[in-house]
């Protein structure tokens, strides 16, 4: 039985920090978007994202994927710092003190609230050193046309940087399936960079996700 006095004395349990209605604030007259702490948010139209892909492809060719990936790594580094600061202050504990399921749920809601689609993590291959990350309704996949390969390089860079800082290991992320190519989701394999060296070639050869994953695991065993 919960004591009434405890309910009156103890602070209210924190809810979902990244709940859209509470996290995103807007002023239509000024054209401003802010988060619940007053930090500025930036809304990017799909035409702008499409122009980034088209322009980089025309100017840099195949190097466009590296440019976007490195932009994602830089973005992910700053995103990780802000993410940790915000949830640590709200939940009154450090990221290291949080249960992994609690941390991932925060990241999932954050991903969705920022308009990046949905995000999920599959940890069943951690015994071999790999994490499988899955996103759906990616704004990046929806604007990149005619690349004939997975195109969410920004997201791959974000995942690489975010989880590298979270784990203290130098991790790398490579996309294996993409909504831009008709897949129902975007899948990424996350692991140590030296273990993922063969993946880029397998993706270029058109190998499916399961085949690539089996190849990686067999190379370790």
Language model feature labels by segment:
Residues 1-131, 137-154, 172-221:
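N-terminal accessory segment detector
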């Amino acid at each position: 039985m919960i004591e009434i006095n405890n309910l009156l004395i103890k602070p209210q349990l924190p809810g979902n920090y990244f709940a859209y209605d509470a996290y995103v604030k807007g002023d239509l007259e000024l054209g401003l978007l802010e988060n619940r702490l007053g930090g500025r948010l930036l809304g990017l139209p799909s035409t702008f994202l499409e122009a980034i892909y088209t322009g980089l492809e025309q100017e840099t060719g195949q190097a466009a994927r590296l440019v976007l990936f490195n932009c994602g790594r830089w973005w992910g580094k700053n995103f990780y710092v802000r993410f940790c600061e915000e949830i640590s202050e709200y939940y009154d504990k450090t990221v290291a003190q949080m249960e992994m399921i609690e941390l991932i749920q925060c990241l999932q809601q954050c991903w969705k609230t920022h308009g990046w689609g949905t995000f999920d993590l599959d940890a069943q291959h951690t015994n071999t050193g790999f994490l499988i990350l899955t996103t759906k309704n990616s704004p990046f996949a929806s604007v990149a046309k005619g690349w004939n390969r997975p195109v969410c390089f920004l997201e791959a860079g974000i995942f690489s940087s975010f989880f590298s800082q979270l784990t203290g290991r130098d991790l790398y992320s490579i996309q294996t399936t993409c909504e831009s190519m008709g897949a129902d989701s975007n899948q990424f394999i996350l692991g140590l960079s030296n273990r993922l060296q063969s993946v880029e070639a397998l993706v270029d050869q058109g190998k499916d996700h399961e085949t690539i994953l089996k190849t990686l695991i067999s190379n370790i065993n």
